[in-house]
Amino acid sequence: MAGISIFEVGPRDGIQNLKHEVKTADKIELVRLLEDAGLTDIEVTSFVHPKRVPNMADAEGVFTAVRMNTSNTVKHSVLVPNKRGIDRAKAVGATNFNIFFSPNSDFNHEN
């Protein structure tokens, strides 16, 4: 029988479109609580344009803090929309990237 894998995206997807600001420390604490709950595959943040998604403007700080305060048994990934996002993520040590695209070229160009 095959196992079940949980890929948690809440620290990114659950926060990115909120209208109110979520503090960096709260994002880091959320990831820690998810790790404490036993999750081992967590999408931590998104390296998108900070003006388009203000709640992800602190992506570097969130990822760096999470990476420094966790065990090596947890896989942390990040969402990146383009090469600039990948470059920003790599600069803080990210190695697991989730990339999105759309069949709509206008959407891809805008994002």
Task: Spell out what each predicted region is.
Residues 2-8, 27-44, 51-57:
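N-terminal glycine-rich anion-binding loops that anchor highly charged ligand groups
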Residues 2-4, 38-40, 70-76, 93-95:
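Short, well-ordered coil/turn segments that N-cap beta-strands
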Residues 7-28, 72-83, 108-111:
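Active-site mouth loops of central-metabolism enzymes
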Residues 7-9, 95-105:
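Non-cysteine beta-strand/loop elements that form the S-adenosyl-L-methionine
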Residues 14, 34, 89, 97:
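Conserved, mostly hydrophobic/aromatic
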Residues 35, 63-70:
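Surface-exposed amphipathic alpha-helices with a cationic face
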Residues 40-66, 100-111:
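Glycine-rich, proline-tolerant flexible connector loops at the mouths of alpha/beta enzymes
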Residues 82-93:
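Catalytic cores of alpha/beta
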